[in-house]
């Protein structure tokens, strides 16, 4: 009888334990939330076109040949915002001229006029004074390139290279500072505190 009592007590304890575990399972709940946060992108592309009569077409990759002193060549430069975020934009324009023998010549014989709303930042860059929306593009940086009418014989068979390098930074949480200009916004590559 003692064994039966112990067996009965053990059996009741097990039943109570199993019941308690089952009840505990009914009062527990679990859930997982997956949150996806995607940042915007700042991407740009230099767009170079030219006016051929009344038709605007892509500027030829091989350039223009047969340019004479005093010539003006159509070269329209804009910057397109291909990213998903609004951006501030600046550009640097480099000009080099190489003779037919590949000697570097004075590049001041090549000129262009920067259009509004672009401004010379005085630091080697031209700044676009308006924010450019995603998918949008700037107005023309310049529309034509001029060659000095006083170019000498050393410029025969020369090649002029005009390089346009563009940079962009986000406008979100990056306004033009009070009493500042677009040149003063944070994040420009090479600026203090920017890697």
Predicted regions and their residues:
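N-terminal Sec-pathway targeting helices
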Residues: 1-11
């Amino acid at each position: 009888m003692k064994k039966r009592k112990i067996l009965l007590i053990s059996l009741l304890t097990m039943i109570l334990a199993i019941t308690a575990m089952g009840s505990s399972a009914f009062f527990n709940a679990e859930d997982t939330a997956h949150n996806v946060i995607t940042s915007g992108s700042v991407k740009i592309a230099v767009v170079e076109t030219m006016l051929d009569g009344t038709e605007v077409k892509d500027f030829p990759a091989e350039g223009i040949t047969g340019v004479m002193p005093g010539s003006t060549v159509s070269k329209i430069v804009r910057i397109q915002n291909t990213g998903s975020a609004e951006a501030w934009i600046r550009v640097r324009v480099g000009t080099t001229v190489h003779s037919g023998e590949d000697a570097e010549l004075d590049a001041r014989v090549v000129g262009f006029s920067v259009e509004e709303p672009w401004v010379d930042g005085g630091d080697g860059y031209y700044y676009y004074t308006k924010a450019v929306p995603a998918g949008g593009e700037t107005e023309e940086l310049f529309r034509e390139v001029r060659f000095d009418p006083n170019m000498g014989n050393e410029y025969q068979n020369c090649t002029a290279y005009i390089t346009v390098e563009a940079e962009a930074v986000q406008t979100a949480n990056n306004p033009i500072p009070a009493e500042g200009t677009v040149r003063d916004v944070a994040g420009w590559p090479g600026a203090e505190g920017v890697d």
